[in-house]
């Protein structure tokens, strides 16, 4: 694997569904960690406040529920991912690319139906806690959602 002129490695998993979340804002995640890669082959990833034994995007904030939401692949060709709120108090919100307003997926303490995500949607976890831009690419990552060769900008989803 060789890097391009920007030090970014090409994607080697072209046949597998991946979703990239580009951090737009967060009070709880390290500043230099900007991209989370969700692998759709293994059931996706949970989002929550506490540590977990399964892949998780951990957001240690009281505004985020212990088991806040799930992201998962619903189609490989074309690549499709969905998000579902698991009954959080402060909500999971999605703003479509062409919209200026957010839609809450479900009322407080009620699980939502899966919401199909589209390229460049914005997902907000909690009222104002953390926001991510959704990136769904058929092939290589764009400059905004690429992880550098050193991996320094990747948000780990490993079980903790």
Residue ranges and their predicted role:
Residues 1-62, 76-78, 116, 121, ...:
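Intrinsically disordered, low-complexity acidic Ser/Thr-rich regulatory segments
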Residues 55-56, 68-122, 126:
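Forkhead-associated
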Residues 64-66:
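Amphipathic hydrophobic-ligand
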